Amino acid sequence: MGRKWANIVAKKTAKDGANSKVYAKFGVEIYVAAKKGDPDPETNTALKFVIDRAKQAQVPKHVIDKAIDKAKGNTDETFTEGRYEGFGPNGSMLIVDTLTSNVNRTAANVRAAFGKNGGNMGASGSVSYLFDNKGVVVFAGDDADSIFELLLEADVDVDDVEAEEGTITVYTAPTDLHKAIVALRESGIEEFQVTELEMIPQSEVELSGDDLATFEKLVDVLEDDEDVQKVYTNVEGF
C-alpha cells in the first residue's frame, strides 16, 4: 500500500504543478479554516493542517498568505461542504467532496460530470458504506515496528503501519490524525509525503482499456471543477 500512496502522490504532484485551479481550491479551504478559528496556524490546528497539505501540493506561499489575509478582513463570503456519491464503469465507485459558495451550481455540475462521462449519481450512502474513513500519513522510512510503538506510546489510535520500498504508511482513526503528525514530528520526522483524511475502499477494482479511459476522464472532469476538493475511488492506482 505504501507504493500505492507514493504513486498517487507522484501523479497528483505532476498534475497539481500545472494546475492553478489546485491553488484556488486550497485558497478556499485555507480561507474557511482561518475564518472558522484564529487566522494564526500556530493556534489553529485545522488551519495548520490545511497549510501543510497545501505545501505538499506545492501551493505558493503568496497564495496561502492571501487566503489568510482575506479571512482576517471583513468579508462574509460563506462556503458549504457537500458530499456526492456515484458509480463509474465496471464496478468503479466514487465519493466526491465539495466546498462551495453555491450549492445548486455544484450539485448540477457534479451530476453533469457523472452523466456525460459514463457514470451515474447515487443516493447518499450508496457508496460510502464500502469505504472507511482514516487518517493517512506517508513518509520516508523502513522500521514500521518502531513507528507503531512510538504512536502507541503517544496514545494514538493506530489502525496499521506498513513499510514498503523505503516508505512508511500510517493509518489512524480520523480523529487522531493530527495527534499522530505531532508525535512523529516530535520524534524528529520533518518531511511528509501525505498527511490526509482519506476514504479508503474496503476492496479495489482494476480497470483497463476503454473502461479505464472512461474512468480517468470522469475523474479529471470532477477534479477540474473549482468546487470539488477531493475525489475518492475504489479503483487501483487512484
From Swiss-Prot:
GO biological process: regulation of DNA-templated transcription
Domain of life: Bacteria
InterPro entries (alphabetical): Integrase-like_N, TACO1_YebC-like_2nd/3rd_dom, TACO1_YebC_N, Transcrip_reg_TACO1-like, Transcrip_reg_TACO1-like_dom3, Transcrip_reg_TACO1_YeeN, YebC-like
Compartments it resides in: Cytoplasm
GO molecular-function terms, A-Z: DNA binding
Keywords associated with the record: Cytoplasm, DNA-binding, Transcription, Transcription regulation
One cellular component term from this protein's GO annotations in UniProt: cytosol
Classification via Gene3D superfamilies: 1.10.10.200, 3.30.70.980
HAMAP family hit by this protein: Transcrip_reg_TACO1, Transcrip_reg_TACO1_YeeN
Record-stated family: Belongs to the TACO1 family. YeeN subfamily.
PANTHER family to which the protein is assigned, alphabetical: TRANSLATIONAL ACTIVATOR OF CYTOCHROME C OXIDASE 1
Protein name in the entry: Probable transcriptional regulatory protein SGO_0454
Source species of the chain: Streptococcus gordonii (strain Challis / ATCC 35105 / BCRC 15272 / CH1 / DL1 / V288)
